[in-house]
Amino acid sequence: MSTTKSNPAVQDKVCMVLATKIIGDKWTPLLLFSLANKTCRFCELQDEVGGVNPRTLSARLASLEEAGIVTRAVYPEVPPRVEYALSEKGRDFIPVLEGMVAWGTKYAA
C-alpha cells in the first residue's frame, strides 16, 4: 500500500508541494491575478506584470497551459491574435490569490 494513500498528512504535504511547483515562482501569482477577471493578450500581460522577460512570460504561460490552469485561444486573423484566460482549474485558484493578497496586506511593512 502507498504511504501517501494511507497517511493523510503525507498526502496533504505531497499536494502542497505539487501546487507550489505549479504556482511557486516569481511571476505566476502575478499572471494569475492579472487573468482573474479577464482575458489578456501577451503584450497586455507583459505590461500588467511589468519587468518580465518575454521569453520567461512565454515559458510560464506555456507551463500554466500545460498544467490546465490557463487556456490559450488563437484567432485566425492577420496579424494573429492570441488571448489567455483562466480555465476552471485556474478560476478555482482565485480564492487562494485573494488570501495571499489579504495576508500580504496585513503583514506588509
Task: Pin down the residues of each PLM region.
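C-terminal flanking helix
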Residues: 63-65
